[in-house]
Amino acid sequence: GKCFREDGVNEFVEKAKTADGFVFGSPVHYASASGMITSFLDRAFYGKSALFQGKPGACVVSCRRGGASAAFDQLNKYFTINCMPVVSSQYWNQVHGNTPEEVKQDLEGMQTMRTLGNNMAWLLKGIEAGKAAGVSFPEREPAQKTNFIR
């Protein structure tokens, strides 16, 4: 399948075929990820979820006050529902600033981002080393659909 809208999702899906891992980011609006990233990920993952399986995923959120953990959780669900290893850091993957200069002043957030990058690189190297040693990602069982109406 292909999304009928021609706004970048299909182009992203093509690039996702050869990607080793993913980092998605969003500002926090009303304690959730932006509607734009949510719509984008809904469409990309719904149509081509198999492309993402086994590839590490991480998300980064940006906010000043509450809502970071809710948005972080919302974005991580795309990874966990699609059998993707989730890359973590030393805290929620959160940083704040309205400009690049302001973000650089968020010392804790910047450290969290560096740790996230290091952890992503380590996991990608580990996956490659595993493949070279003959260890592959577990084969998925056929999905079982539960219907409580019998």
Regions found by a protein language model. Name each.
Residues 85-150:
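Glycine-rich phosphate/pyrophosphate-binding loop and the adjoining helix
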Residues 4-91:
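Helix-loop-strand module that forms the ligand-binding subsite of alpha/beta enzymes
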